[in-house]
Amino acid sequence: MTQHSPYSSAIAEQRNQEWLRFVELLRQAYAEDLHLPLLQLMLTPDEREALGTRVRIIEELLRGEMSQRELKTELGAGIATITRGSNSLKSAPVELRHWLENVLLKSA
């Protein structure tokens, strides 16, 4: 059995706070129409490409017309990435899933 030290708990909390700080910064950037320059500053080209691929993975998983193996071939993503997307989608709140369906599938 793995013991969790207070140190690892403190680091996890710090990382969560840093994430929430970034989310708030991004929210403010959207409000001031500075979101694109902020994201270009914060993310490398590879990270931006990976996010785009993840959106496509979620979109195709919601559509349900391709197997995970077909998605791997179509998108050039690793099967582990697609499986993580599938598992995340399964555990996503119903409201988020409905919103994603509306945004990603009905606008396509």
UniProtKB/Swiss-Prot annotation:
Top-level taxon of origin: Bacteria
GO cellular component: cytoplasm
GO biological process terms held by the UniProt record: negative regulation of DNA-templated transcription
Localization terms from the record: Cytoplasm
GO molecular function annotation: DNA-binding transcription factor activity; sequence-specific DNA binding
Location, primary (coarse class): cytoplasm
Record's keyword terms, sorted: Cytoplasm, DNA-binding, Repressor, Transcription, Transcription regulation
Stated family: Belongs to the TrpR family.
Role noted for this protein: This protein is an aporepressor. When complexed with L-tryptophan it binds the operator region of the trp operon (5'-ACTAGT-'3') and prevents the initiation of transcription. The complex also regulates trp repressor biosynthesis by binding to its regulatory region.
Subunit structure as annotated in this protein's UniProt entry: Homodimer.
Name listed for the protein in its UniProt record: Trp operon repressor
Organism listed in the record: Salmonella paratyphi B (strain ATCC BAA-1250 / SPB7)
